[in-house]
Amino acid sequence: MFLKVQKSDISGSISIPGSKSHTIRSLFLAGLAKGTSVIRNPLLSTDAVSGVNVCRAFGSTYDLNNESYVVNGMGACPQVPENVIDVGNSGTSLRLGLMTAALVDGYTVFTGDYQIRKRQIGPLVEAINNLGGKAFTTRGNESAPVVIKGRATGGYTKLDCVTSQYLSSILLNTPLLEKDTHVEITRLNEIPYVEITLWWLDKLGIKYSHNSMKEFFIPGGQQYRPFECTIPGDFSSATFFMVQAAISERELVLTNLDMSDPQGDKAVLDILADMGAEIKYDHNNIKIKGKSLKGREIDMNSIPDALPAMAVAACFAKGETRLVNVPQARLKETDRISVMCSELTKMGADISELPDGLVIRESKLHGAAVKGYDDHRIVMSLAIAGLNCSGETVIDTAEAMNVTYPGFVESVKSCGGKIELI
């Protein structure tokens, strides 16, 4: 599908859908708990469905009633899946599921779409082997398809976390192992996502300790208890509308966002305020009004998912903006550094690549035919660019939005946006 976008005056109020990070973690934890859990306001997207499918394969049941999941969890001993588990496009579901598979007394095989079959999982595979499981990639290239055999027991491993999902997988599953686990971290990107995982462990009474996130100690023999929760809004999805308001000099009100939540992408609000946007907070409502933005250097390591949207914001900021220290952005669904450089160039941006980021100078953008590369964040970021430049912008692979924000087009239209799926 294609997304056709024209310059629009956007203002009004948008309710942000549930957090993907919280939704998928809650789905896995409900499955690992013995008993019935209730998850309200989950994200309903293809990524979340992938998480449900992974957990169902291990023996839990998931029923969606009135936009809430009722989960009957399998507990600490997942069953052997009846078939290969296809995670679709969900890297989170794959990586969290790998260590869950190491709890199984038998074999589990994971695969996914063409993007998943290129994404790195080597360090996590190595860690599973070190903790007493058996794991290997079928092509020997550190990417899915991957075979896991449990049951892991615990022990010591080093872990190179080019993505925080490796550590989250270990943290969520090792409390259920027989022995204690000691993880030494050699590199850790995206720390706020680990903080979300630790928030869940705290909520469910799991014991652990860490040394400034350089070493983690997780006692074995623990159990998850069933729980009820309400998923907060997704700051990563809200980023597109934060940028939209900041560059348009109009006001948007974003609702269903909890500033006390550990999601890292709420930092985008402070960044945009520092660049010149006007931000006001009223309980769970955030008012954003654009003013003249000024370029600056921004360390994106903790908020890599915001890179595509911030690249668009930088095109409208006076002077030069440098988005730096985010090499892991090259390892997402696409190489987001390269892709945003190439597609914004088509729209007239003065932009160049760094090994770990982008350099962007104020630019006068124009509409163009651009590629979305089957990447939800690329598609939606280019749509925001198209809403704020002359001419018509057409973006391919628009169906990728369903990964995290199926209602994106409706949200834009509700505030006056000229946007259409064709």
From Swiss-Prot:
The active site is at residue 305. Transmembrane segments: none annotated. Its main location: cytoplasm. It catalyses: 3-phosphoshikimate + phosphoenolpyruvate = 5-O-(1-carboxyvinyl)-3-phosphoshikimate + phosphate. GO terms for molecular function: 3-phosphoshikimate 1-carboxyvinyltransferase activity. GO terms for biological process: amino acid biosynthetic process; aromatic amino acid family biosynthetic process; chorismate biosynthetic process. Phosphoenolpyruvate binds at residues 20, 91, 119, 165, 336, 377. It is found in: Cytoplasm. GO terms for cellular component: cytoplasm. 3-phosphoshikimate binds at residues 20-21, 25, 163-165, 305, 328, 332. Its EC number is 2.5.1.19. Pfam families: EPSP_synthase. Pathway: Metabolic intermediate biosynthesis; chorismate biosynthesis; chorismate from D-erythrose 4-phosphate and phosphoenolpyruvate: step 6/7. HAMAP family: EPSP_synth (MF_00210). Catalyzes the transfer of the enolpyruvyl moiety of phosphoenolpyruvate (PEP) to the 5-hydroxyl of shikimate-3-phosphate (S3P) to produce enolpyruvyl shikimate-3-phosphate and inorganic phosphate. Belongs to the EPSP synthase family. This is 3-phosphoshikimate 1-carboxyvinyltransferase. It comes from Ruminiclostridium cellulolyticum (strain ATCC 35319 / DSM 5812 / JCM 6584 / H10). The lineage of its organism: Bacteria, Bacillati, Bacillota, Clostridia, Eubacteriales.
